[in-house]
Amino acid sequence: MAGKTRVLLDRPTRRAAILRAAARAFAERGFAATSMDDVAAAAGITRLIVYRHFDSKDALYAAVLQDVRDRLAESSAAFAGRGESVAVRALLAVGREDAAGVTLLLRHAAREPQFASYADEFREQVITYADRLMRLAHAPARVRSRWAAETLVSFVFDALMHWLEDGDPDLDDAFLARVDASLPALVTAWAGVS
């Protein structure tokens, strides 16, 4: 009778695998309903191995959120200079490789009091970016408001989450083109209203 072959991973690779498995488990069950045993099962390892990398469930959840934010920053830098929708392209790229992690950051973390700062800080960065883009596009001053920037960000986040859930990855370029066309159209429509 042959047993399972044990796969030894180096520490960074194991940590990354745990983070991805934890993101899936937390996104599926929520923070409160997910145990470290659930994370271990999702990662195909023992709870002891999870604890070798993370002291607590809180530390693990925070690490998942920070990892997603770090990868979004790296992806944004990689897409820099490729048009105005750098943030959307970065969100989609990371979302395609880790939909659960992006879901935690954009949807779940804001509702978890001990983790809301991760979502709030990220959202604030994107709102500031949206406001800067409106200024660069010479949007009228009456349009450039906190409300407008927040509305654009809400539109992008919701559109992205729905696309990740229901959209065909082969049509990602079409999705990006629609978002690229929609954002200026919204700002232009707002500018036309007195």
Give the ranges of each region predicted by the language model.
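Amphipathic alpha-helical linker/stalk segments
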Residues: 28, 62-89, 130-132
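Amphipathic alpha-helical segments used for helix-helix packing
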Residues: 94-117, 131, 158-165
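N-terminal intrinsically disordered/low-complexity leader segments
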Residues: 1-13, 134, 138, 143, ...
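Short hydrophobic/aromatic patch on the recognition helix
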Residues: 44-54
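Amphipathic alpha-helical segments that line or abut small-molecule/effector binding pockets
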Residues: 20, 81-100, 146, 150, ...
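Amphipathic alpha-helical packing segments from all-alpha helical-bundle domains
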Residues: 113-138, 143-154, 174-177, 181-188
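Basic, helix-initiating cap at the start of DNA-binding domains
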Residues: 1-29, 33-44, 58-62
